[in-house]
Amino acid sequence: PRYIVFGGLVFQPLDTNLFASAKFDDVTVRRLYTDYMPKGLFQKYRDVVILTRIESDPITSQLGDFTGFAVDKINGVEVTDLKHAYDLLHPEKTPEFHVIELFGANRPVVIPATKAAEAEARIAKAYGITKMENLTD
């Protein structure tokens, strides 16, 4: 499956398999899934990107309630697909913080950019992750 692991956050595109295997409590995610084709959301979003997991790490210790939400914006830019999300999380000029806005969340997820790479190294080692992203089917 396609995915991104960034600073302990795991992002995946919403598809039928993910929708069937995960219990999404967020009404917005369910609505995005059911409206994707009938209401033409595919014209705006090639993928609906979901924050599916938050791996345990000091950088993510306060972020437990954000799993299962759809990503709206990263660093102020509306996300159109998984590759776009990856590009926004890995810009040429790194910001001080990565701000990830989720549809329906009370506040954004904020990750200190300098700590994201350190967290990824710890998480890769702890969970045996050899590749932090897979952007192709």
Q: Model-derived features: where do they sit?
A:
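C-terminal recognition in membrane/secretory proteostasis and scaffolding
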Residues: P1-D137
